[in-house]
């Protein structure tokens, strides 16, 4: 097994294969970002605030249609609160105005009240630039891996270690 480490060419080849896999994944992510016009075209539902529409761990695919069509009441959007890097998935419940100046109020389907307390300080509504994208599709429970990795940091280290060992010890 460890004989592959003795051959520097084979070790370099395996390292390059691993780098190729990582760069391909990155390019696919960036390509999807460009096509969807969203900085985060795929997000994971982190809480139960949108149940029963979406469960914790669902993987959501986003599309940012602000050029073609306006965000409407009833649409499920993902937004980021200014100054925080946490995507929030909620439904637009009220809209004031039209176009890029429209003000939007959101609420989780499973929440009692609207999201005003979640917005940034001195912000009563969302504007279109706060929206990361609208939900167009989802895959149930696939995102649980992300939740597990964030809740149990040791699991992330173990998975990276196992993947590294597989790459190093792989025989071709």
From Swiss-Prot:
The active site is at residues 49, 90, 115. It is a single-pass type II membrane protein. It is found in: Endoplasmic reticulum membrane. Residues 36-172 are lumenal. Keywords: Endoplasmic reticulum, Hydrolase, Membrane, Protease, Signal-anchor, Transmembrane, Transmembrane helix. Its EC number is 3.4.21.89. One of its GO terms (molecular function) is serine-type endopeptidase activity. It catalyses: Cleavage of hydrophobic, N-terminal signal or leader sequences from secreted and periplasmic proteins. Residues 1-14 are cytoplasmic. Residues 158-169 are annotated as: C-terminal short (CTS) helix. It is an enzyme of class 3 (hydrolase). Catalytic component of the signal peptidase complex (SPC) which catalyzes the cleavage of N-terminal signal sequences from nascent proteins as they are translocated into the lumen of the endoplasmic reticulum. Specifically cleaves N-terminal signal peptides that contain a hydrophobic alpha-helix (h-region) shorter than 18-20 amino acids. Component of the signal peptidase complex (SPC) composed of a catalytic subunit SEC11 and three accessory subunits SPC1, SPC2 and SPC3. The complex induces a local thinning of the ER membrane which is used to measure the length of the signal peptide (SP) h-region of protein substrates. This ensures the selectivity of the complex towards h-regions shorter than 18-20 amino acids. SPC associates with the translocon complex. Belongs to the peptidase S26B family. This is Signal peptidase complex catalytic subunit SEC11. It comes from Colletotrichum graminicola (strain M1.001 / M2 / FGSC 10212) (Maize anthracnose fungus).
